Amino acid sequence: MCKKTHRIIDFRPQANWYWLFDHNRAILTLNMGDRVIDIVYKPEMLILKFDQPVFFTIEDVANYMDLFEGPALGDYWPALRSQIILHALVANQFHKPIMPKNWLFESSVGEQPRVHKGDHIILKSSAIKEAKKYFVLDNDENFILCMLIEKSHGLTFNRNFVQFQIVKVTYDKIFATKADCNTLSQYV
C-alpha cells in the first residue's frame, strides 16, 4: 500500500528563483527550485536579452509580495494568485509594448468607469459576445493594460485569448468593474 504524502507549497519568493528562457521549448520559464512555471507569452512578444538565469530582484520580491498579500487577488487560490503575479511581473519586465486592440471588444453604454492598477474588469468580445474577467496591470488617461484571468476568452469563432494573455484597450470597452465581476451572467 502506497502512502500519500501531502506537501504544502510555499508561494513566497525565494532567493533561488530565477527566469530562464528554455531554448528547446522556446518558452520563458521561472525556476522556483522544486518546480518550473511556464510563462504563456510567445518569445516574439518578449524582450529577451539573456541566455543566463535572471534572478528575482528585491523589486520583484516586493512587487510579488504586495500583490500576493494584498486585497486585489485575495479571492484566488494561492497557486492561481502566484501565476497571475508571475505573468504580471513578466508583462512589466520582459513584454514588448503592445498596441490597443479595441476592435476585438464591444463598447459599453453609459459612463466610462475609471479603473486603477489591481482592479478587475469585464471585457466582452465584439464578434461572439463572450464576457470574461481581466486584471488591470496598468492604466493611463486613455488606455488600460489588462490580463485575462479566466482560462480562455473567445474573441471570434477562430480566435481565443489564453489565460494570462495581456491586451490594451480604451476605457469605453469596460463592461463592469470589480464590484460587478461576481455577476458575469448579466453581461453575456
Swiss-Prot record:
Coiled coil region boundaries: none
Subunit: Interacts directly with FtsZ.
A biological-process GO annotation: FtsZ-dependent cytokinesis
Pfam families: ZapC_C, ZapC_N
Disulphide-bridged cysteine pairs: none
Main location group: cytoplasm
GO cellular component: cytoplasm
Domain of life: Bacteria
DNA damage found in the keyword field: no
Protein name: Cell division protein ZapC
Family: Belongs to the ZapC family.
Keywords (A to Z) from UniProt: Cell cycle, Cell division, Cytoplasm, Septation
InterPro entries recorded: ZapC, ZapC_C, ZapC_N
Role, per record: Contributes to the efficiency of the cell division process by stabilizing the polymeric form of the cell division protein FtsZ. Acts by promoting interactions between FtsZ protofilaments and suppressing the GTPase activity of FtsZ.
Subcellular location: Cytoplasm
